[in-house]
């Protein structure tokens, strides 16, 4: 009987066995007393699922009481619950053809979806690398199918996007998003690339696309402050690893920009790069970076790090903001917050 249970658990490594005590990884590094007010000093970084290829875009679905996330190379979404662990959620999340695509360069083909978000109407919105668009899943959240409505697939110049990476909604219904070339088969040198830059964009409710910035080499994670007055964007570039802050007018248009924090000198010291980020209700920023997840105050002061050991790509809060979920390469992690 014990052998049978062990064999079953081995088959379900990627999902985890319900009721198990999770393995832990990493540590917490506090640089400021405020860090301990946000992350409990005795919190553990739990590995709640593992065995993936390269995961991204964690998103909690309140109506389904589950976390969904992208496993980019296999072109699919998974969902995680405490009861079931990780199970399949959606096939063909970023590309409707076969993967890997012919001629891709790099360690693996990034044709799948990346960032995930909920529309104001509680529909799943996907940043689709392979299809080079941002799309809305037209089927219900409790009956997911690869059936999509394109929200935007061409920029302000009528050119195809590179591979939309991440996005966030403004209270007025407009959508901010980033467009680096990671999802193109040939990367930045892909022969089908139509722009020679990586953009930060705004899609208004009426469908108008506005270019916010074309000067970032690899714009990536993106999030809004609680008061909607500041847009934060991570730039995942080895020689210009920064977070930008864009000051917004009431209508969501940009009136100014500045570098919030530069961590270029930290690149290579630990696994990671400025990538996905989220902001809590008090304006504190939980941003993936060298070493794991950095916690920053609204002015960019580094308060402490949730050290993940693996390359952290993105984060998501539980509905009550008391739990932080972290996608870290092949691992799905969880840490309790205060």
Residue positions per predicted region:
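Sec-dependent signal peptide recognition
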Residues: 2-10
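Sequence-structural signature of mature extracellular/luminal beta-sheet repeat domains
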Residues: 17-338
